[in-house]
Each structure stands twice: as C-alpha cells, then as structure tokens.
Amino acid sequence: MSAQENKAIYLRVVEDLNQGDLQPSLRFTAPHATLNGQPMGREGDKHRAEVLAEAFPDQRYEILELVAEGDRLVVRWRMTGTHRGDLAGPIMTIPPTGKSIDIWGMSMYRIRDSMAEEIWERFDIMEFLGQLGVIRSPGQSEEASPT
C-alpha cells in the first residue's frame, strides 16, 4: 500500500475511535504486532483499548501531525477525556478521579497489508498521572498535591 493509503486507513481508525467504535482499531493491529519492541498482538491491543475506553468513556483523539513514508507512519496526537472509570494498569488500578486529561504523544507504525505490525509509542506518563491527581505535577504547589 502507498503512504497515502496508509494515512487514509489511520485517519479512518481515529474517526471510528472518536465515535466509540474499537473494532476498526483492532483490525488495524496485526495479530503478531509489537508495542515498543515487546509482543502485544491484537489481543493485547484490544485489552489496552478496552481499558482506556472504560477509564475515559468520552476520550477523543486529535491528530496534530501525520507523516507517512513507505511503510512508516508517524503521528503526533492529542488525547482528551474525563477519568470516569477504573484505569487498570500493570502495577496498580487508579479508581475514577473525575479529572479531565489533555495529553499528547507520538506513535510510529510500520504497516504491512493495511495493518500495524510494529508500534512505537511515547507520551509523558508523569504529566498524565499529574493531571489525574495521582502524583504532583511539576510546578504544582504542596497545597494542591494529592494526599
């Protein structure tokens, strides 16, 4: 597929995610996909998508920048949402805080046959946890920090 076709597929996936439909996103992930060099597969991505959808039922994604070349796709994105459900992570579960988040990150995909086989993703986890009130954000006063 061409770089332009890969961009079009990705934009449709984001559009569907913003409508609350996780299925196209899961079909975009190859059954043997890796995330940050570790095996994840479609089932791992399904779990990740379901956890985020439960924790942030009003989640919205905005594409800030999208670059494609050959089989590579690089995205600078923004995610907003309100923490209304449990956020189950690998170390702990964060109960709903009712706080809004507004984070950005970058993802890079290697695409083959219309599916992401390799995903590299980064965002500022400390900023994310600070916005949830789980940790004190840089510059946040002691009085405003969680107890």
How should these model regions be labeled?
Residues M1-T147:
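C-terminal and inter-domain tail/linker signature
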